[in-house]
Amino acid sequence: MNDRRILVALGSLALAVALGLTASGRAASSGQDRTSRGGGIFKISLNAASGIDYLDPALASTPPAWTLLDTTCARLLSYPDKAPPDGFRLQPEVAASVPVASNDGRTYTFTLRRGFRFSDGKPVRASAFARAINRVLAPAMHSPGVQFARDIVGAGQVVSGKTTAASGVVAHGNTLVVRLTRAAPDFPQRMASMFFCAVPPTLPLDAEGAGAFPAAGPYYVVDYKPAERVVIRRNPYYGGRRPHHVDGYDVDLRAASPQDVVKRVDRGDADWGYTLSGIYFDPTLGLVERYGVNRSQFYVKSGLTMRMIAFNLSRPLFRDNPGLRKAVNFALNRRALVAAGGSLVSRPTDQYLPSILPGFRNADVYPLDHAELKRARVLAEGNLRGAKAILYVNSSAIPMAIGNLVRQQLAEIGLDVVVTGIPIHSASAAYFAKLATPGEPWDLAFGLWSPSYIDPFAYINLLFDRRFLGASNFTRFASAPVNEQMRRAARLPQGSDRSSAYAALDVRLARDLAPAAAVDFLNEVTLVSGRVDLGCVALRPVLDLTAVCLK
């Protein structure tokens, strides 16, 4: 299988999570509580550097793409437009109820609600979701979502090109039955990801991605011209309960730069834009002084994208060398690394699970506000193995500044770090595919991780389970006892026992094995124009476009 589009965290934009996946804050009451808000066209500005890659749900892997798809997507299950803890509670959307697994945990049966229709008027049947799953598995698509469907019975035969439909996916009328090779309590959460939006049963395979096609969500894409525009309008046959106040969205993809995106919104030429969080804190823009934070039009909310320094365990320096990996963790001054991008951009962390996830346990494994050099030097002594390391970072200004800070900090424990700028965004699928390439000569890599659905599996297992070696497990961490502990946790049903098991894994991995050095979790930053009714601004933590309304 080609893993060039492995699922990754994307940009300093912790989107994945936001789109129907979680609610981390709300500027005001949700538009969902209001019956009607006057229509109008909501204007969006995007730039190529932080724009969309595809509008095909099987292929999309950037935050803005998922943000737009959230307006058009109808899923079996989704999450409410509410702040946590309610925002983490899975609820049915097209499905009539959240499914209960069979006694052996390997079969899920979804019964669809009546009333959902595509924008061409055709009814949504179970075949729409079967097609979505099989498109993700199709080798011609190279979908980053394939890792969420690997354990469906027959998935391997589709991925290998031997058949076009997984035998474990059976659609009949309004009933969808999915059989798995092993128990997977997180399977309903996976079905809430954007990869499994309802699509027309005849939607063809296209490695370049389908653009404008019938959708079953509140809106649908009328026109898409890459690098130019996207036109989205109301689905006249929408049969769901999601808010949909505006008449549609006009998306201009031609902003000259990330700064231009923000400037367009600030002066009212656009109502919202998506760009790197750090751009908003450029002092020349003066947004904090003009709007304040979380008061009027400008919002900073805790996000779910982790920035980390990954260790390459396939190379001699860090392979079978947990002492040096822990030494690096103690030598880092995380607060200083955060300050390189602006103090409001993120919050430092030393663990792999976000603190807003249910069950999180703060273990204070490593210092956040300073380096602990005495302890770091003791751990590094005798473990430096030549004391030279190659650090990959994106070649743009802020990542390079962070890379040089890391170089200076690790010099304190005797490690000579060469910072290598890579002209690929450090949150892009291409960057993570490069890290996963066998023989790629990196020892340390600065990157970002954001889940496609809310479950600790999406942080712990996807990053560190040996089943995902060469894909999302780009560190190549492989520990038999820890793998067994991860898989036991994955088999637990949703609830406090599962949360506690993953909290223990999080602490064990960070404290004892350190396959990566967690640095911080990015905040999500939102600026809206003066045309936007702030009573309809719902932050999940990215702006919920379906809920917006205009004054």
What would you call each of these model-derived segments?
Residues 33-35, 169, 295, 326, ...:
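Extracytoplasmic/peripheral linker and loop segments enriched in polar/acidic and small residues
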Residues 45-103, 212-215:
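N-terminal lobe/hinge region of extracytoplasmic solute-binding protein
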Residues 80-85, 180-248, 259:
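Gly/Pro-rich hinge or "lid" segments in bacterial periplasmic/extracellular proteins
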Residues 205-207, 237-286, 416:
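Ligand-site clamp/hinge motif
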Residues 109-111, 128-130, 135-201:
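Surface-exposed binding/hinge segments that line
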Residues 314-357, 401-402, 508-518:
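Periplasmic-binding protein-like
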Residues 526-551:
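Long beta-strand-rich cores associated with HINT superfamily self-processing modules
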Residues 343-381, 394-401:
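Structural transition elements
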